[in-house]
Amino acid sequence: MVALFVVATILLCVGIELLRDRAKQRKAAPSAAQIPADRFFLPKGFFISKAHTWVELTFSGEARVGVDDFAQKVIGSIDRIEVAPLNKELNKGDTLLTVAHDNRVLSIPAPISGTVLTVNESLLASPQMLHQDPYVAGWVAVIVPKNISTELRLLAIADDAARWLRKEVSRFRDFIKEQAQIGVPVPAGVTMLDGGAPLSGVLEQFNENTWNAFQKEFLKAE
């Protein structure tokens, strides 16, 4: 009887310790790591492309893809989203999706090659999901990759991705200043981006020429 009591006590202690360890792991591994300077997020374990899309590998060998936090924030309001159709064979750099606001449209390239297996129908019905949760609920598509081992080497992850994003934010501020210098109408407050003004929704205030320039500078296929 004493032996059974001792065994039960040990099992109880082990169970409590396991629960504590899991709680610590959850606290130590948040779903997204914040970029301190500009309030943009990068999830741990996601690969980021230079065209501001991301790749998350699944346990089944497929790849979930979407738009990063920087792009969705600076674009601002989105009226509609169109995604490459099911079973579409995409090469890296082909158009994965288009986003539109009024008469302005941006084409966002696929970060990897493969076949479109699933499209996020909820996102198509509610484009605002891209703003609310770009890395989880706002995913764009699931792709069956074909050159994943090679193409992942061209993407950034973790600290490398964070450093690159900080440079992109700085480059975007310079881009907005250049737009002002060439005579593009600049909304009030936007010219103060170098002073730390919010970047959210900046592009929706600009005309089609600026959107086209943003496409060439920040969303070009690699």
What is each model feature region?
Residues M1-E222:
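Contiguous, well-folded functional domains in the mature portion of proteins
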